[in-house]
Amino acid sequence: MIIFEYKVSPAWLSPDAPESIFRITVTSDKENNVITWFHDKKYLHTIPTSEINKIKSIIKDHSELFRVPECLESNTVLDGEEYSFIFSDGKNTNSFSGFNILDYGRSPRKNATLALRVARTIKEKVLDLNGVRTMIPTRLQRWPKYRKPSNDIKI
């Protein structure tokens, strides 16, 4: 059973294409329960069951993840990256994806920010401590505040 998955892939790929820039999958298996892919190179890791339970409890603490719709936003331009998430606490499971959710100049997306925050927490509290390298961003994107253009031009 997949407990956590974070995947970044080019938005122009078909959904079933195996290529991805980065993917990490954490399962409830006893052996090789953390699988990472960097540009289609597969790496297997084994972490203790207690660490898997920590991931489940982090996800359980953010129960609003299970109410996120399947698609965070539509892909109107086939450009940039697609971000996909799977979260499971052992009982409930939800998966969703979004396109270009880290771009500057776009309005912040509450659900994407929540998912990235939880992924970052899993990275910092479990994966990093067990020596699993990931490409989950450690800092969340900061969107610049909108400023209304001024009619007064100062020269």
Predicted features along the sequence, with ranges:
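Short, solvent-exposed loop/hinge segments that bridge or flank secondary-structure elements
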Residues: 13-26
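Charged, amphipathic alpha-helical segments
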Residues: 48-75
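Short, well-ordered, aromatic-rich surface patches in folded extracellular/luminal domains
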Residues: 1-14, 67-155
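Alpha-helical scaffold elements adjacent to nucleotide-binding pockets in ATP/GTP-utilizing enzyme cores
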Residues: 4, 26-28
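A short, structured loop/turn motif at beta-sheet edges
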Residues: 28-30, 47-54, 87-93
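Acidic/histidine-rich, surface-exposed loop or edge segments in extracytoplasmic proteins
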Residues: 29-43
